[in-house]
């Protein structure tokens, strides 16, 4: 593929693990990288949470350290990650994000459960974790965390001009990438921010009404009518006018549940899906130049109704990342493998244009099996 620059360091195999705010399960992926370029993709897998575990995680949302519900959630997260990775091939490093329960960038607080030292001892591999704290300590939002990897992906696919990678998870986030810039931390290489609610309000609606874990394929929304008044009011929220970089807690738009409470199941799903698509359009309005393509990762790309609404709202080429040879189910897990190698090699993992941090900074604590934390 294009973008195969000469390696600065010998590439190593690393694993990355991600448990997102859609509560689907643990995504694990292997990546061969030198921390700058992508050399090769390895195996990827997802281990789904049980209904009981998913309920525990939902109950723990919004919890801060010290709360009993957070401790129970941590046990679920650690056990699921160990199960997902116990039989992986040997790797040099594991990048572990943990499960976000609460995120308040204005107060410089964030909470991901899951102890990297527990995983290091259980799996016998060095674990790099807690990627957000250093960034937030220097004034950053602590999120989004995948933009530097998105830059590497844009170069790997040989993008010839600006491209945007949109992740539609519980919260949506987008990275605008100029692949001609020689490093992701350099000015002009990346602009990244959360776009707003994505799958979370739709998923919560389905669970609340006993309709399942998600609107599979957007089939329910496709049968509904959009309530334009609710849509317009939702997209008038002041948050959408804030200049990036910016990040959002999963439940920041939880008031949407009350807004659609009087609608039928189909109309409620259609309206929330339109809000998610409209949030992406509001986000792209902050970009200084339009990307040639918007490549979509995350569970939302499997929602045909949401994808069609995003296409209509943006009016540019919108397609799933699989169309350019990437794995949308593994992308975020791969990102943490990539970031782990960057941390191990002293490279930045965020920059002013991705999180608002004062200067490029490398985040992440390091835990080796049977040893004290390294940093």
Curated annotation (Swiss-Prot):
Q: Which Pfam families match?
A: AnmK
GO molecular-function term, one example from the UniProt record: phosphotransferase activity, alcohol group as acceptor
Q: Which reaction does it catalyse?
A: 1,6-anhydro-N-acetyl-beta-muramate + ATP + H2O = N-acetyl-D-muramate 6-phosphate + ADP + H(+)
Binding site residues for ATP = 20-27
EC number(s) per entry: 2.7.1.170
Pathway, per Swiss-Prot/TrEMBL?
A: Amino-sugar metabolism; 1,6-anhydro-N-acetylmuramate degradation; Cell wall biogenesis; peptidoglycan recycling
User: Which stretches are annotated as coiled coil?
Assistant: none
Task: Please give the positions of the paired cysteines in each disulfide bond.
Answer: none
Q: Name one GO biological process term.
A: amino sugar metabolic process
Query: Cross-referenced InterPro entries, in alphabetical order?
Result: Anhydro_N_Ac-Mur_kinase (IPR005338), ATPase_NBD (IPR043129)
Q: Where is this region: Disordered?
A: 351-375
What keywords is this UniProt entry annotated with?
ATP-binding, Carbohydrate metabolism, Kinase, Nucleotide-binding, Transferase
| Domain of life assignment | Bacteria
Spell out the family assignment given in the record's similarity comment.
Answer: Belongs to the anhydro-N-acetylmuramic acid kinase family.
Which HAMAP family does its entry note? AnhMurNAc_kinase
Quote the function comment for this protein.
Catalyzes the specific phosphorylation of 1,6-anhydro-N-acetylmuramic acid (anhMurNAc) with the simultaneous cleavage of the 1,6-anhydro ring, generating MurNAc-6-P. Is required for the utilization of anhMurNAc either imported from the medium or derived from its own cell wall murein, and thus plays a role in cell wall recycling.
Per its UniProt record, what NCBIfam families does this chain match? PRK09585.1-5
Q: What is this protein called?
A: Anhydro-N-acetylmuramic acid kinase 1
In the UniProt record, the gene name given for this protein reads anmK1
